[in-house]
Each structure stands twice: as structure tokens, then as C-alpha cells.
Regions:
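Hydrophobic alpha-helical transmembrane segments
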Residues: 103-130, 196-205
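Cytosolic juxtamembrane amphipathic/interface segments immediately preceding
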Residues: 20-32, 183
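Hydrophobic alpha-helical transmembrane segments of polytopic
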Residues: 37-47, 112-113, 135-142, 194, ...
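Hydrophobic alpha-helical transmembrane segments of integral membrane proteins
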Residues: 4, 20-22, 115-162, 217
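Short, intrinsically disordered terminal tails adjacent to the first/last structured region
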Residues: 1-22, 101
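Membrane-interface capping segments at transmembrane-helix boundaries
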Residues: 210-217
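Long, glycine/tryptophan/cysteine-rich extracytoplasmic
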Residues: 53-106, 151-189
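N-terminal signal-anchor transmembrane alpha helix
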Residues: 32-61
């Protein structure tokens, strides 16, 4: 009986010890989602940081008298390119100058980037599905809102024409994306790389749950 009892106790100890041991495969399954979330979050934050220094919107003006064209690049805090010459040409049709100084959007852009980074961190660390979706939506709304804001500003200048200008044209709305033709000028407008990278960050954050689902056994 003593031998049987000791043997039984040995079996019980072995079972207890093995119960505390987590197989390597299980450990890998636990670590993999953390790595995926961390990598996607870092990549998204990197895209957002780069986007903060790139143009939000660009426009190229083409006309026979300008064989090299004219360029306009709108950043979060400034406008570069041939702004002076474009404003001089716009004066002939009574269009007000593109004056971006003092616009609320210009002052808020750094805050927008900070909010986007905070949303990216939240989307990665939260376990609540609704909160993750809300954070991803916040990042998606940034490029959409930026284009909508630029379109509104373009509508403003296109419908604020001076009736006493040397050349009178019908009020018009320049397109925020795509070509706009006025007299002998054709303007090609498109989103800047900043919005492309922000949309890429949003897509990356949104795809994390689907990636984890594919990786799960």
C-alpha cells in the first residue's frame, strides 16, 4: 500500500508541475497579437509624424504663356510655390488673393496631428471594440475634413469676385481634386502627401483586427 501511495503522490506532483508549464506554442500565440499591435501602432505614428511636414494640398496651373506652369503647395502652417504670381493673375478676374495667414486651420494643424497620434495609440492599446473604431474613425476624418475645408475655401474665393475687375467671369468653384478650366488656364489639384500618409495610417490601424483574426489558429 505504501508503494502505491507514494507512486500516486508522485503522479499527482508531476501533473501539478505540468499544469503550470505553458507550451511554447501557446506563448507564441499570446505574444504575436502584442507584436502586431505594437508594430502597427509604431508604423502609424511614424506616418503621422512624417505627414506633419508634408503638403496637405497641391495645385498646378498650366497655360500657354507659362510653359513650365505654376505650382501651389499648401502645408499645415504655410503656403509655398508661385503664390505671388498666382495672386497677381487672379486679380485680373477680381478674385481675392489667396491669403492663408491667420486662418484657424493653420493654427490648429499641429493640434490635429497630436490628436491623430493620440487616436493611433488608443486604437492599439484599447481592448474595447467601440473605442478602437472611434479612434480609427477620428484618423480617417482628418484627410476627409482637410479636403472639405480646402474645397470650402476655394468656393469662397471663386464666389467673391470683384464686379469692377478688368475681366469679368461668372462665379465658379475650383475643384479641390481634379482639373478646373478657366479661360486659357487649367488647374490640376490633388491631395498632398500629408493626407495620403494620414489615410495610410488610418488604413493600417483599421486593418489590425483583421490581421489578428487571420493569424489566430
Amino acid at each position: 500500500m505504501s508503494r502505491r501511495a507514494s507512486a500516486g503522490q508522485a503522479v499527482e506532483r508531476a501533473v501539478a508541475e505540468n499544469a503550470d508549464v505553458v507550451p511554447d506554442s501557446a506563448k507564441k500565440r499570446e505574444v504575436r497579437p502584442i507584436l502586431v499591435r505594437g508594430a502597427s501602432g509604431l508604423a502609424a505614428i511614424g506616418l503621422l509624424l512624417v505627414a506633419a511636414r508634408l503638403p496637405i494640398w497641391r495645385a498646378q496651373f498650366a497655360a500657354p504663356q507659362y510653359p513650365n506652369g505654376l505650382d501651389l503647395s499648401a502645408y499645415g502652417n504655410r503656403v509655398d510655390g508661385d503664390l505671388g504670381e498666382i495672386n497677381e493673375l487672379s486679380h485680373y478676374i477680381g478674385m481675392p488673393p489667396f491669403n492663408f495667414v491667420g486662418m484657424p486651420e493653420m493654427r490648429l494643424w499641429p493640434l490635429v496631428i497630436v490628436v491623430a497620434i493620440a487616436a493611433a495609440v488608443l486604437a492599439v492599446v484599447t481592448r474595447r471594440r467601440w473605442l478602437r473604431r472611434l479612434a480609427c474613425l477620428a484618423v480617417w476624418l482628418i484627410p476627409i475634413g482637410a479636403l472639405a475645408d480646402v474645397q470650402f475655401r476655394l468656393w469662397q474665393v471663386g464666389h467673391s469676385l470683384d464686379p469692377t475687375s478688368p475681366i469679368r467671369v461668372t462665379p465658379f468653384t475650383p475643384h479641390v481634386v481634379g482639373p478646373t478650366t478657366l479661360m486659357n488656364f487649367t488647374v490640376h489639384a490633388y491631395p498632398g502627401m500629408a493626407l495620403v500618409l494620414i489615410a495610410g495610417a488610418a488604413a493600417l490601424l483599421t486593418s489590425v483586427p483583421f490581421i489578428l483574426k487571420r493569424l489566430s489558429p
